[in-house]
Amino acid sequence: MKRVLVAMSGGVDSSVAALLLKEAGYEVVGAMMRFWPDLPPPSLEAGKPRAWESCCTPDAAYEARRVADRLGIPFYLLDYREVFEEEIISPFLQDYAQGRTPNPCARCNTFVKFGALLKQARRLGLDYVATGHYVRKEGLALLRGLDPHKDQTYFLWGTPKEALPHLLFPVGGLTKPEVRALAEKAGLPTARRPESQNLCFVAGDLKGFLKERLKPRPGPLVDALTGEVVGEHEGASLYTLGQRKGLGLYKTHLERYVVGVDPERNVVYVGPKEACYFEGLEGEGLNLLAELPEEVEVQVRYRTPPVRAKVESLSPLRLRFAHPVFAVTPGQSAVFYRGERLLGGAVIRRGLYNLAGLEDPRALTFS
């Protein structure tokens, strides 16, 4: 009998993943990785979650254990706080401090779930690690989830190629309503649990978290086209490319977007919307799960459709889009597809071929 470790989050997707694998005849072991700091014990009253409702919190651990008890499988809480701080939180803060906008969920899959956790599972003699991701797997190929509204391949581009034979994604061929229906039928306590919308390590709003950890200082908002100071920002690390709201412009009639961030000089550059459009990108940290053809589809944000692009070079990685793309943001993921198949991805270093002909704003002087 094949043995599988199911990474349980306390949500319905990983709960149903465990259910399906047990029904398929696997020997299932449930586990949750503890990422959070020491907090007060969770409320044990069913249906009364804490205000901090997210995956991998104490309340979520309680729900995951209830699911394991219902399924009759063992459940373990694994202490991954040190690994998570080193591999996820520290790089996350460093990226923001450098004016980038990171994608911690993609990094977590690469280095924690399909890195450290898989290695531990193999050491314990388990054959597979399974998750509740909406991803399909055919042989060693990863395909978009059947439910287009829930597809999560965007976050799996960094999966180590050598990990692919040991990964299972049981809910990838289902829609979210089907997953909830299976959970209801099996009497799983997570059947109606709301989806987590927050980063698992941010107890509140992201801006407040960054202010607490990075201690940003106010500084000038500079028009990238004229060099004029047009407002004051709250701290360069709090802004991202393409942002329009909350800029603090002196002249409120101006329609301006963030077009660049210079954390060294503590300057945020703003400009017209067209200055946020790019016809290409340069990437770093390329990870390929399949051969990259000369022309690919590339997705630069989770909720935006992919755009056709030509691969100009691999070292450095440079792509040219078939049409301009808004807010090609340093630190975010550029993920490559051929049809429904995930080919790999990279971290965006910078956008190329700016539609407004804008140079790197950090090279500008201002008054």
Swiss-Prot record:
It comes from the Bacteria. Residues 150-152, 301-302 are annotated as: Interaction with tRNA. It holds the Pfam family tRNA_Me_trans. Its EC number is 2.8.1.13. The record marks H133, Q332 as: Interaction with tRNA. It is found in: Cytoplasm. The keyword ATP-binding applies. One of its GO terms (biological process) is tRNA wobble position uridine thiolation. GO terms for cellular component: cytoplasm. It catalyses: S-sulfanyl-L-cysteinyl-[protein] + uridine(34) in tRNA + AH2 + ATP = 2-thiouridine(34) in tRNA + L-cysteinyl-[protein] + A + AMP + diphosphate + H(+). Keywords: ATP-binding, Cytoplasm, Disulfide bond, Nucleotide-binding, RNA-binding, Transferase, tRNA processing, tRNA-binding. Its main location: cytoplasm. ATP binds at A7, M8, S9, G10, G11, V12, D13, S14, M33, G132. Gene3D superfamilies: Adenine nucleotide alpha hydrolases-like domains (2.30.30.280), HUPs (3.40.50.620), Translation factors (2.40.30.10). The keyword S-adenosyl-L-methionine does not apply. CDD domains: MnmA_TRMU-like. Coiled coil: none annotated. Disulfide bonds join C108-C200. Belongs to the MnmA/TRMU family. Catalyzes the 2-thiolation of uridine at the wobble position (U34) of tRNA, leading to the formation of s(2)U34. This is tRNA-specific 2-thiouridylase MnmA. It comes from Thermus thermophilus (strain ATCC 27634 / DSM 579 / HB8).
